[in-house]
Curated annotation (Swiss-Prot):
The keyword Transmembrane applies. Belongs to the peptidase M20A family. Glycans are attached at residues 118, 466, 541, 555. Residues 1-31 are annotated as: Disordered. Binds 2 Zn(2+) ions per subunit. It holds the Pfam family Peptidase_M20. This is Uncharacterized carboxypeptidase C24C9.08. The active site is at 199, 266 (proton acceptor). Residues 1-37 are cytoplasmic. It is an enzyme of class 3 (hydrolase).
Length: 596
């Protein structure tokens, strides 16, 4: 694990120069911090969810819902340890060989040097300052000039990492997809693929006055680098580049091929970036032709007195449902019992009825809880007892009382967009509705299709409205109908396969072994479920070993932790250094790891 050494102080020290400029900002920044509530970070980060819920950081409703003791859900005599899900923690793995930069400087020593600490910061900042923003309405590459900024980004990558471009194979896929290959000597070994994405989400212009520093300034302040993209996902992209550059400088010749695959539109589902990259790899290596894929995902956090690294081994499914209701217009002085908007509002209240869910042994979240209970130093005894009992019915009842927990085993419902009406005093003729669902991994998209099929048919009969479902079939049809509702979908994705995380998986052993080597042998590597989706959705045919984990540690009690996708996004710089060290270690361990 990298040391948190302060930057070297010299006449040319960029951090010192920035710190001097920041001194006058200290008071106002701290004032802003005291007057702003930090977000819980990205909703899909399981450990932060767990910490806030069980440590009292969730909202008041959640605290009230969970205030009763978990012990009240069960008799103490019934607490038998479940054998349905084991918390397997692989051994620490160390590299059998390590490259040298010169006669007596190892790669890891160089990464931990003050010189590298300073120089790497400058490179990180330079790439963060390029606003590689991806918007929901992006057109195709070549037709939409908003993609041109990625050429600027890649020119800077070429300038900052010259040895990668001199010694490794670099390819551009669909213009801006970046594929870097460090060829291995043993062609019988399947390659290791490290993923990241170059794009970032837009900055809400109305929020600029709430940023401590301009969102693309990449300002270093109090050990943090503030910038859009610092946490999602340029931290990983830059860390992988740093690791590969060091290996290129050292002329490292691995047995296993190592590939970096960087998309450029992950924030809008990756169809122009990750999908063509995945196709290229499939053409080259074939079905199941890759050993392991690692992309962004869970974090490492100190929870219940233990350091947990939550490696997401699966993702929930995804569906956007679009509904369009058409009715006759007219003068508002003679309205029907329900206007178009009124009818759609009736439907919304029905749509928002929860799906309900059930925590099953097969759900990775069940194993997450088992690992917490088995390895945490100071978890509440009643909660530990409940989890280890394996009583999924009582666990479901308890955890479903909080919105922070329930969506790890239940399909979510978010009515996000509604539009209707054009003028006061004119009856609306059309209302549209968009609903987002993250689909329960145990149910699949069929659950959502079936739910809407029944719900819309019942709605149509109740309000005398014709109904056409997703497949174009009209299931309710009246000659004198007062309207017609149409259902369609835009983006859909079945829940991902579950990647292996037991003793039989060499891939999981290597990943977990490298994590524990980097972050310490006291780290509990824990499988988890990803409620959100990543670019890995396009890579399923390449391997069954797909893992989602971001190699940084975070302190969830800090209001200043990362803030991905929102104001004051930042990365603790020592956490970024840990990322570099991890990717460097992981490449070596995957190639030649041995038990410590």
């Amino acid at each position: 694990m990298s040391t948190s050494n302060d930057p070297v102080v010299s006449s040319h020290d960029p951090i010192k120069q920035e710190k001097e400029q920041e001194t006058d900002l200290e008071a106002q920044v701290e004032h802003k911090k005291r007057n702003e509530r930090g977000n819980a970070f990205v909703g899909f980060l399981i450990l932060i969810f767990v910490y806030y819920l069980l440590r009292g950081g969730s909202n008041d409703n959640d605290k009230q819902e969970m205030s009763h003791s978990p012990g009240s859900c069960m008799d103490s005599e019934s607490a038998a340890v479940s054998t349905s899900a084991k918390c397997y923690i692989p051994p620490v793995l160390t590299p059998a060989k390590e490259p040298k930069l010169g006669d007596d400087v190892s790669g890891i020593d160089y990464i931990r040097s003050p010189e590298f600490f300073n120089d790497s910061l400058v490179r990180f900042q330079e790439l963060l300052r390029i606003p590689t923003v991806c918007y929901d309405d992006m057109g195709d590459v070549g037709d939409d000039d908003r993609f041109d900024i990625f050429a600027v980004f890649q020119d800077k990558v070429r300038e900052l990492y010259p040895n990668i471009f001199k010694k490794l194979k670099v390819e551009y896929v669909n213009t801006y997809g970046l594929l870097i290959t460090l060829e291995g000597s043993n062609k019988d070994l399947k390659p290791l693929v490290l993923m990241g994405h170059q794009d970032v989400v837009p900055v809400n212009q109305a929020s600029l006055d709430r940023w401590y520093f301009p969102p693309f300034s990449a300002t270093y302040h109090n050990g943090h680098v503030y910038s859009r993209g610092a946490a999602d996902d340029k931290n990983s992209v830059v860390a992988i580049l740093e690791a590969l550059e060091i290996l290129a400088i050292s002329d490292y010749k691995p047995e296993q091929t190592v590939i970096a695959s960087f998309g450029f539109d992950e924030e809008v589902s990756g169809y122009r970036g990750a999908l063509p990259l995945a196709h290229k790899l499939y053409e080259r290596y074939g079905k199941d032709g890759v050993a392991l894929i690692l992309d962004e995902g869970g974090f490492t956090i100190n929870l219940f007195g233990t350091l947990f690294a939550t490696v997401c081994v699966a993702e929930k499914g995804y569906m956007d449902v679009h509904l369009k209701l058409k009715t006759p217009g007219g003068h508002a002085s003679i309205p029907p019992p329900h206007t178009n908007i009124g009818l759609m509002s009736k439907l919304v209240t029905q749509i928002e009825e929860p799906f309900g869910g059930e925590l099953t042994f097969e759900n990775p979240f069940y194993t997450t809880l088992q690992c917490f209970a088995e390895n945490s130093a100071d978890m509440d005894d009643n909660l530990r007892q409940l989890i280890k009992s394996g009583d999924t019915e009582k666990m479901t009842d308890l955890f479903s009382k909080s919105r922070l927990y329930r969506y790890f085993f239940e399909t979510s419902i978010a009515v996000d967009v509604i539009n209707g009406g054009v003028k006061v005093n004119a009856l609306p003729e059309e209302t549209t509705l968009a609903v987002n669902h993250r689909v329960d991994a145990s149910k699949g998209l069929k659950q959502v299709y079936d739910r809407y099929g029944g719900l819309l048919e019942e709605f149509g009969h109740e309000y005398h409205v014709n109904v056409t479902l997703f497949n174009g079939e009209t299931v309710v049809e009246y000659e004198d109908a007062i309207g017609h509702i149409f259902a369609s979908t835009a983006k859909t994705l079945e829940p991902s396969p579950v990647s292996p995380y037991d003793e039989s998986s060499d891939a999981y052993k290597k990943l977990a072994g490298a994590i524990r080597y980097t972050f310490g042998d006291g780290t509990s590597v824990t499988p988890a479920l990803m409620p959100a989706n990543t670019d890995t959705r396009h890579y399923w045919n390449l391997t069954s070993n797909i893992y989602r984990w971001t190699p940084v540690s975070t302190n969830s009690t800090s209001k200043n932790s990362f803030n991905g996708h929102t104001i004051n996004e930042n990365m603790r710089y020592d956490a970024h250094m840990d990322s570099i060290e991890f990717f460097y270690n992981f490449i070596l361990v995957s190639d030649s790891g041995e038990e410590a």
